[in-house]
C-alpha cells in the first residue's frame, strides 16, 4: 500500500476491534478499552486533526500499528514550503483525491506525516512545525526529540 516516505494512500480497513496479535508500536497497555498510546513527551497521545481527518487509522490521531510502514506519527502544521518540498519528492499532498476521501492539504492544516519525510524536510531546512502532544512516541525511532522540540508549537 504505502512503502515510500509518506505518499498518500487510503487508510487500511480497520474494524472496531484490534486484530489478533496486534500490539501498538509503543507497547501501550489497554486501559478503559483504549490503547495507551504515548506522545514524544511521555504523556497521552492527543488528537492531531479531525478536519481534515488525519492519521494512519483516520481517527484524528497520529497513532500507528505494524501495518504502518511509513510510520505516520509526526503531527505537523503544513506550510507552503513543506507542501512544495513534499511534492518535489513525489508526494503531492495538495491535490484532492476524492476517490480516497482526501481533500488535499493547505498551509495551516495539521497532518500526520511519515517520520522519515519530516526528518528529510528537517535535513533540507524546510521542516514544518510540530505538535509534540500529538506526535506519537514511535517517531523517536526516526527523529531526534531535540529537533522536534525546536519545531514545536506547543512548548512554552
Predicted regions and their residues:
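Extended boundary segments
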Residues: 6, 17-81, 152-154
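Short, compositionally biased
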Residues: 118-141
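Short, basic/aromatic beta-hairpin or loop at an interaction surface
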Residues: 77-92
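Short alpha-helix capping/helix-loop boundary micro-motifs
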Residues: 94-101
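Glycine- and charge-enriched low-complexity intrinsically disordered segments
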Residues: 137-156
Amino acid at each position: 500500500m504505502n512503502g515510500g516516505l509518506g505518499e498518500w494512500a487510503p487508510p487500511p480497513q480497520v474494524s472496531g476491534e484490534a486484530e489478533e496479535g496486534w500490539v501498538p508500536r509503543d507497547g501501550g497497555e489497554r486501559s478503559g478499552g483504549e490503547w495507551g498510546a504515548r506522545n514524544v513527551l511521555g504523556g497521552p497521545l492527543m488528537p492531531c486533526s479531525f478536519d481534515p481527518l488525519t492519521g494512519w487509522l483516520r481517527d484524528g490521531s497520529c497513532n500507528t500499528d505494524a501495518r504502518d510502514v511509513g510510520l505516520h506519527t509526526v503531527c505537523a502544521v503544513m506550510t507552503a514550503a513543506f507542501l512544495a518540498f513534499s511534492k518535489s519528492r513525489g508526494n503531492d499532498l495538495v491535490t484532492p483525491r476524492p476517490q480516497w476521501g482526501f481533500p488535499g492539504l493547505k498551509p495551516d492544516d495539521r497532518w500526520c506525516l511519515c517520520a522519515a519525510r519530516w526528518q528529510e524536510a528537517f535535513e533540507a531546512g524546510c521542516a514544518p512545525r510540530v505538535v509534540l502532544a500529538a506526535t506519537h512516541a514511535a517517531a523517536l525511532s526516526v527523529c531526534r526529540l531535540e529537533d522536534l522540540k525546536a519545531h514545536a508549537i506547543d512548548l512554552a
